Amino acid sequence: MLILGFESSCDETGVALVAADHGERPRLLAHALHSQVAMHEAYGGVVPELASRDHIRRALPLTRQVLAEAGRALADVDVVAYTRGPGLAGALLVGSAVACALAAALDRPVLGIHHLEGHLLSPFLSVDPPQFPFVALLVSGGHTQLMRVDGVGDYALLGETIDDAAGEAFDKSAKLLGLGYPGGPALARLAEFGDPTAYALPRPLLHRDTLDFSFAGLKTAVRTQVLKLGEGVCEQPRADLAAATQAAIVEVLVKKSLAALRATRLQRLVVAGGVGANRSLRSQLDAACAKRGVRVHYPEVSLCTDNGAMIALAAAMRLQAGRATARRDHAFDVQPRWPLAALDVGVP
């Protein structure tokens, strides 16, 4: 079974082809990704209308590229999958329209996929895939969640952010520091030259008996420190503040993940989403989990960002597990707001 997957939830257009033979782990045959970072950089953030227009321009050329790299024809595709939500409504509509139009032209079934489920399952494309059950730390864009995962489609929410997500804390702090877009990677790069102990920043909810997160107070503390520094400050204090900010976010993510592992008595942790590519987070999680005999699994770094491979993979795993049915009516809708915990089994 060949599954063609489309991702268009925000500012990346992703297309991928996955092979899912009966009883075997899905294999990624080819994938292509176009990032809109350069286009949105001048605006300091994603402009939804521009994002939608660019998805229209990129979807079919990327599809041709993927098929050529895989040595397959469009007629070889058995199922077409797309990101149904959550995300930007216009961007989601572009991806779903392209996917459903292709499926209708080919007379193939189509399947809508939850964006966060794609991230959650993406480590199954790595050379060292996890086994169920496990705890998942999802740190993607506006989402920060801890989930217990007992199988495909079997997810229980353990904790989530009550305000800003970790990715938003990175991006908003970077903006306060006058760094470029996207802010998270820029802050992480600057943090390499700073002293994380130079500023005492808060770790909200860290010592509370909860697996929920809160990063709004940290953002406020960073703003306060930036105002104290004033304009024209030299680079070192900015690097120190970047390092302290990253240290605060990472400490919360690591300690909450360990608490979730203790609460569930599980020995496997999956970390997925864009923030999962952060080197400081990976190194500290690896060290903390190694002391406790916990296995940690990540996606390949290139698959931490939004991509079509994770959508095609999630579709393959859902179909193999009997947790979804691809449909042939080719009508489509999108879910810009769609909690993963509310994901219904069998809803295309």
UniProtKB/Swiss-Prot annotation:
Gene3D superfamilies: 3.30.420.40
Lineage: superkingdom: Bacteria
Annotated catalysed reactions: L-threonylcarbamoyladenylate + adenosine(37) in tRNA = N(6)-L-threonylcarbamoyladenosine(37) in tRNA + AMP + H(+)
UniProt binding sites for substrate: L138, V139, S140, G141, G142, D171, G184, N278
Major subcellular location class: cytoplasm
Enzyme Commission number, as recorded: 2.3.1.234
Entry's localization field: Cytoplasm
Database matches in InterPro entries: ATPase_NBD, Gcp-like_dom, KAE1/TsaD, Peptidase_M22_CS, TsaD
Alphabetized UniProt keyword annotations: Acyltransferase, Cytoplasm, Iron, Metal-binding, Transferase, tRNA processing
KW tRNA processing (keyword) present: yes
Protein name, as recorded: tRNA N6-adenosine threonylcarbamoyltransferase
Organism: Methylibium petroleiphilum (strain ATCC BAA-1232 / LMG 22953 / PM1)
